[in-house]
Amino acid sequence: MHASLDGFVGGPKGEMNWIKIDDELFDFVGKIVDQADVGLYGRVTYQMMESYWPTAGDKPNASKHDIEHSQWYKRVDKVVISNSMKGGKIPKVQIISGDINEGIGQLKQKEGKDILMLGSPSASHALMHHNLIDEYWIFVNPILLGVGIPLFKNIEAKVNLKFIASKVFASGVVGLHYEKS
């Protein structure tokens, strides 16, 4: 999850044009993404991803990152947290609605690699509320937004975290890795 130094993950209207992305960060995040075989999204982020990533790697001007992430996106199962998303069976997509504890609990019991949530602030807030996030990678960008969508919301009890690693990027972004202790 990208965040501003003052703790916002999006501007007041969800804007993300302030996020510093470059090849160094793409390569680093690509290694994290490769450790996952499930992409976890909120409905809005899933729809945004679905409109771009399935064909992003096929475009003539596709970057190395576009090709790699497009291949990953098409390969992995997607899980969408949504009470409003309806529709027929979508290949490689599972929708969790209603009891988020039960849905995520069942997902965590499955064999496989990591479950990775990219973005999805509303879904992240719901998972935080139920203390369902095991690890955090937060990429702090060198900007103060002042207002916007907060990184942390709906946390009702203290959650102890253990520092795992940090990474400073040439762009000024600092990656922070924590896990629940």
Would you name each region that the model predicts?
Residues 1-132, 142-181:
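Portal/gating segments that form or line small-molecule/metal binding sites
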Residues 135:
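Short, conserved catalytic or interaction motifs in soluble domains
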Residues 139:
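Non-cysteine beta-strand/loop elements that form the S-adenosyl-L-methionine
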